[in-house]
């Protein structure tokens, strides 16, 4: 809108140049008419020149108003197209970001489920091993007890030693299973690694969505700037060219009117005949509207 307003002002300056030339022609024609008798050819000439000048000025004003409106409409259309581009980019970004976020969330949830399943499997395996070893130790103790009951107290010590060895071995195996589950690189660490990888993947996905949004915003701003600058500069250049043409045409009309008045003005009844340089400055003959294009 700022560029359209500037273009309208440039066109108005061209109208002002024509208006000044036409006003000067009207004033000169009226002055010549006042020096001549009423109803003479000079008076008619002055009135007709004034009417043509007024008509030409009105046409110029209408043309300038129409061109200013056209420039404003072009600028408004460019701005609306840029806004539509921005809206489409925002909608695309939202849809893309939503899909990316959902995919990242699914990957995180899958990693968590995998880690949970691995930990539960390790826990179940440790419990099963401990239960098996406990059953074996109980069976060995019962066997030893039966041996003692059958063979007497002389083998009690041997049975105790055997049972102690079996229990010690079972306890050692259970401790090894527990250490393997909690040691570096074990099941717990693997579950933690899966969880960390899932979180990193989600962070990368969100960062990519943010970068895409910034690129769309830059493209939208560039589209607005290009559309507005192109429409405004073209209209302003046309208005400035018309302004220069108006000034040149006004000067030519003044010289032509001065020459015609000095050469063709009729002699008044009292013998007065305007000489070159004494007639209206910038007046125009019939049929030549001042400033009309």
Curated annotation (Swiss-Prot):
Gene Ontology CC annotation, any one: mitochondrion
Compartments where found: Mitochondrion
The entry's keywords: Mitochondrion, Repeat, Stress response, Transit peptide
LEA 11-mer repeat-type repeats, residues: 58-68, 83-93, 123-133, 134-144, 145-155, 160-170, 171-181, 199-209, 210-220
Biased composition range(s): Gly residues: 279-293
Coarse class of the protein's main subcellular location: mitochondrion
Low complexity composition-biased segments: 27-43, 230-265
Positions of region (Disordered): 27-52, 217-293
Keyword Transit peptide annotated: yes
Record: transit peptide: 1-31
Record's miscellaneous remark: Improves osmotic tolerance of human cells.
Membership in a protein family: Belongs to the LEA type 4 family.
Function: Mitochondrial heat soluble protein acting as a molecular shield in water-deficient condition.
UniProt domain comment: Contiguous repeats of the 11-mer LEA motif is characteristic of group 3 LEA proteins and form an amphipathic helical structure under water-deficient conditions.
Protein name: Group 3 late-embryogenesis abundant protein, mitochondrial
Species the sequence originates in: Ramazzottius varieornatus
Gene: RvLEAM
């Amino acid at each position: 809108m700022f560029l359209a307003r500037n273009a309208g002002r440039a066109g108005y300056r061209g109208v002002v140049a024509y208006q000044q030339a036409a006003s000067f022609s009207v004033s000169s024609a009226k002055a010549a008419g006042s020096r001549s008798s009423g109803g003479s050819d000079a008076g008619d000439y002055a009135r007709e020149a004034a009417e043509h000048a007024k008509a030409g000025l009105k046409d110029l004003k209408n043309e300038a108003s129409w061109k200013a409106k056209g420039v404003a409409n072009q600028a408004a259309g460019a701005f609306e197209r840029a806004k539509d581009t921005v809206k489409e980019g925002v909608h695309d970004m939202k849809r893309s970001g939503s899909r990316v976020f959902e995919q990242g969330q699914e990957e995180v949830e899958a990693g968590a489920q995998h880690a949970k399943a691995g930990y539960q499997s390790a826990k179940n395996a440790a419990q099963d091993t401990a239960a098996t070893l406990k059953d074996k130790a109980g069976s060995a103790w019962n066997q030893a007890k039966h041996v003692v009951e059958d063979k007497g107290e002389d083998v009690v010590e041997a049975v105790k030693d055997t049972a102690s060895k079996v229990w010690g071995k079972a306890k050692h195996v259970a401790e090894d299973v527990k250490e393997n589950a909690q040691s570096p690189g074990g099941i717990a660490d693997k579950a933690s690694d899966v969880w960390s990888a899932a979180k990193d993947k989600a962070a990368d996905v969100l960062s990519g969505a943010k970068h895409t949004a910034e690129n769309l915003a830059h493209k939208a701003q560039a589209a607005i700037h290009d559309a507005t600058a192109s429409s405004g500069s073209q209209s302003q250049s046309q208005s400035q060219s018309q302004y220069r043409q108006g000034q040149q045409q006004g000067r030519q009309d003044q010289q032509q009117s001065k020459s015609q008045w000095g050469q063709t003005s009729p002699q008044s009844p009292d013998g007065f005949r305007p000489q070159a340089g004494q007639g209206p400055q910038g007046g125009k003959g019939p049929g030549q509207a001042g400033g009309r294009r």
